[in-house]
């Protein structure tokens, strides 16, 4: 009996020693592998910082120009540019190859073929609802039209900033704005927005909640309206629901990868006077209106200076000018 117990103890002791030896051997092997891989990674990282001839050399058709030899990415060689323009532009140009021509001209400014995308929009309303600002840099050309100054100005405020928006059910609820960054954005073919401020007893202040005719009108037959009311006061709203929608939005901050070029007009529209607009580099500019070819030539000529005032996109590819959250 004692012999069996001694044998059992001896078996477990030998097993423990054997397992310890195996684990120690495996540990040494793992240490060797880890140290070796670390050494290889360090050596490769050092070599990768060396000059890499030809990687960032733009092909312009001529090798006479001296280019700085660098391993850093060029400013535009890995970037995309979206150019948005009204539908009247290609109609006036009347040239099926005008985009190819502009692509070749952008190439002379350092933008490779295939990095510039041309996007047409029919009107301010359609563009404001779904702008599709997908590129690293987005430049919007807006033709100045008398009588549409307000729509253009509010479109600029919309797409030059990022917004977080919720749908509003004005038939069931009262709404209030909680700060300067909180606005109500209405869109449609014809938006008329009326409001009735309420006191703590939900009685109208200067208006009757049961009589829409007594409401104050804050937007009249507009395609796009960014409505601002007194903060921290409940309001009952009325809109032309058949031709308009309204959302409760909060301005998150500037969208620095978007710029607007106003085409024509005596003065450039200025949105920096808005108290919700933080001090920032001006990304609205104006070019003289002559012909659309002249406008595009001007854009190509100054494209790099324009982009210098912008910041490259940092959000997802599928980013619009406002986020719609249910």
Swiss-Prot record:
GO terms for molecular function: metal ion binding. Ca(2+) 2 binds at residues 177, 228-229, 231, 301. Glycans are attached at residue 69. It comes from the Viruses. Residues 165-167 are annotated as: CNP motif. It is found in: Virion; Host endoplasmic reticulum lumen. Belongs to the rotavirus VP7 family. Homotrimer; disulfide-linked. 2 Ca(2+) ions bound at each subunit interface in the trimer hold the trimer together. Interacts with the intermediate capsid protein VP6. Interacts with the outer capsid protein VP5*. This is Outer capsid glycoprotein VP7. It comes from Rotavirus A (isolate RVA/Human/Italy/VA70/1975/G4P1A[8]) (RV-A).
């Amino acid at each position: 009996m004692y012999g069996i117990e001694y044998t059992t103890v001896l078996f477990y002791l030998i097993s423990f020693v054997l397992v310890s030896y195996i684990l120690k051997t495996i540990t040494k092997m793992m240490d060797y592998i880890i140290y070796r891989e670390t050494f290889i990674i360090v050596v490769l990282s050092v070599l990768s910082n060396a000059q890499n001839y030809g990687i960032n050399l733009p092909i312009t058709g001529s090798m006479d120009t001296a280019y700085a030899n660098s391993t850093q990415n060029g400013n535009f060689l890995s970037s995309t540019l979206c150019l948005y323009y009204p539908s009247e532009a290609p109609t006036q140009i009347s040239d099926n190859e005008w985009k190819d021509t502009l692509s070749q001209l952008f190439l002379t400014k350092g933008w490779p073929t295939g990095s510039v995308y041309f996007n047409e929009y029919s009107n301010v309303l359609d563009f404001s609802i779904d702008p599709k600002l997908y590129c690293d840099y987005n430049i919007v050309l807006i033709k100045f039209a008398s009588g549409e100054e307000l729509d253009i100005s509010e479109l600029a405020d919309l797409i030059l900033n990022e917004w977080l928006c919720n749908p509003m059910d004005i038939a069931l609820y009262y709404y209030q704005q909680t700060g300067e960054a909180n606005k109500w954005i209405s869109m449609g073919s014809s938006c008329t927005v009326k409001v009735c401020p309420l006191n703590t007893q939900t009685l109208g202040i200067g208006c009757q909640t049961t009589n829409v005719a007594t409401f104050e009108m804050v937007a009249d037959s507009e395609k796009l309206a960014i409505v601002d009311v007194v903060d921290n006061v409940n309001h009952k709203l009325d809109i032309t629901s058949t031709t308009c929608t309204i959302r409760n939005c909060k301005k998150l901050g500037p969208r620095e990868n978007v710029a607007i070029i106003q085409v024509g007009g005596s003065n450039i529209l200025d949105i920096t006077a808005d108290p919700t607009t933080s001090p920032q580099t001006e990304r609205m500019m104006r070019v003289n209106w002559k012909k659309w070819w002249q406008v595009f030539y001007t854009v190509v000529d100054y494209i790099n200076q324009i982009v210098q005032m912008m910041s490259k996109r940092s959000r997802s590819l599928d980013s619009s000018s406002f986020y719609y959250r249910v």
